[in-house]
Swiss-Prot record:
The lineage of its organism: Bacteria, Pseudomonadati, Pseudomonadota, Betaproteobacteria, Burkholderiales. Pathway: Lipid metabolism; malonyl-CoA biosynthesis; malonyl-CoA from acetyl-CoA: step 1/1. Residues 39-293 form the CoA carboxyltransferase C-terminal domain. Belongs to the AccA family. GO terms for cellular component: acetyl-CoA carboxylase complex. The gene is accA. This is Acetyl-coenzyme A carboxylase carboxyl transferase subunit alpha. One of its GO terms (biological process) is malonyl-CoA biosynthetic process. Acetyl-CoA carboxylase is a heterohexamer composed of biotin carboxyl carrier protein (AccB), biotin carboxylase (AccC) and two subunits each of ACCase subunit alpha (AccA) and ACCase subunit beta (AccD).
Length: 322
């Protein structure tokens, strides 16, 4: 698949287009231009390194939304085996913006749950662009409770702009569904390992992300609101999204410094979409390390640790004024 370049990546796009053009010419030419192609390829790689070493929070937000970025089912195919998808919330409907089911991780039975956005227009509409309704969160809750019943560790993958804000979702109890999920996750007797793989948007993300360990990909985001939404509220225009992204502190390194996530998994040069298989390999290693941390831990110890973790959020110190 041809790489889609973001607006701030246009200098890289121009170089890659030139390289592609030279490769096409070389196929029908007796002149050897492989040296020039190699030179431009090295230049493109260095430019990518320089650009990605100095990303702004707004640029990171754009990478997190990249249309070719790996989604939950992409990681499921690469990381897990024997995946068997389970459907429906047993109350209203089957929300396809959340996928989940039984699988094996390194041979061990587990439960996998995650947001799924969709690749083309038809699938995006079918999956509601990854914005879940109450039935999606209730499906996730059902699968968590099933895993808890059979003693299976839970892996969740977060990638959503946020919970669906439609009237029908509110009528069916959107906030109650999210709140109930938080209640269930707090009391699980099995470990839950959450990974932010793209957008982590507000309560819609938190509804499946209250893990014993929270992992975040290098160019993923996690915030209470989207930069555009924040800008529209504070400045009455979405054009201030870059400033809002800076103020929200939505990047992995900022959140790690605040103690809100536990681990950052570096992405391949240019983002996860440039090399999905390598990204999946690195993430699988991180998931295995996190799971080992909780294996053999008593239920009481696991729950006590989780309680301490949750109670530690929002701590602050007061300093005397001068």
């Amino acid at each position: 698949m041809k790489t889609t370049f973001l607006e701030f990546e246009q200098p890289i796009a121009e170089l890659e287009a030139k390289i592609e053009e030279l490769r096409f010419v070389q196929d029908d030419s007796a002149v050897d231009i492989s040296e020039e192609i190699s030179r431009l390829a090295s230049k493109s790689q260095q430019l990518t390194k320089d650009l990605y070493a100095n990303l702004t929070p707004w640029q990171v937000a754009q990478i997190a939304r990249h249309p070719q970025r790996p989604y939950t089912l992409d990681y499921v195919r690469e990381i897990f085996t024997d995946f068997h998808e389970l459907h429906g919330d047993r109350t209203f409907a089957d929300d396809l913006s959340i996928v989940g089911g039984l699988a094996r991780f390194n041979g061990q039975a587990c439960m996998v749950i995650g947001h799924q956005k969709g690749r083309d227009t038809k699938e995006r509409a079918l999956r509601n662009f990854g914005m879940s309704k109450p039935e999606g969160y209730r499906k996730a809750k059902r699968l968590m409770e099933l895993a808890d019943k059979f003693g299976l560790p839970i892996f969740t993958f977060v990638d959503t702009p946020g919970a669906f804000p439609g009237i029908d979702a509110e009528e069916r109890g959107q906030s109650e569904a999210i709140g109930h999920n938080l209640f269930v996750m707090a009391g699980l007797k099995v470990p839950l390992i959450a990974t932010i793989i793209g957008e982590g948007g507000s309560g819609g993300a938190l509804a499946i992300a209250m893990g014993d360990s929270v992992i975040m990909l290098q160019f993923a985001t996690y915030a209470v609101i989207s930069p555009e939404g924040c800008a529209s509220i504070l400045w009455k225009t979405a054009e201030k999204a870059p400033e809002a992204a800076e103020a929200l502190g939505l990047t992995a390194h900022r959140l790690k410094a605040l103690g809100l996530i536990d681990k950052i998994v570096n992405e391949p040069l240019g983002g996860a979409h440039r090399d999905p298989k390598s990204m999946a390999t690195m993430l699988k290693r991180a998931l295995a390390e996190s799971l080992r941390q909780f294996q053999g831990m008593k239920t009481s110890e696991l729950q006590a640790r989780r309680h301490e973790r949750l109670m530690a959020y929002g701590k602050f110190k007061e300093t005397e004024g001068r």
